[in-house]
Amino acid sequence: MVKHIVCWNLFENAKGKTKQQNALEIKEKLLDLKNKIPQIQTIEVGINSDKANPDNYDVVLITEFNNFEDLEVYQKHPAHQDFVEFVTPLRSDKIAVDFEK
């Protein structure tokens, strides 16, 4: 099993929306990837709580794949590429980690 974890920091305002509005749209689009990319075994998306440290990242994605080959299929999938194109102008920073469980 391979875990793929990505965190994004978002601009305060981007594309005419607030950070919170964009975070909610990002979450919706990410969760929808499970319906489009069968290689995703599990998917979870979190938005940093307003009660949490404001220095935390704004949005986190946690996905699981059977192997690195499935992760590669996911990353090249047109639905994932569409998401990358959508999120890029909204984010100020991104980090990611991929590891085997």
Describe the residue ranges of each PLM region.
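Short S/T/G/P-rich N-terminal loop/turn motif that feeds into the first structured element of a domain
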Residues: M1-Y57, N66-E72, E100-K101
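C-terminal structural segments of small proteins and small subunits
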Residues: F68-P89, D93
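Short alpha-helix boundary/capping motifs
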Residues: P89, F99-E100
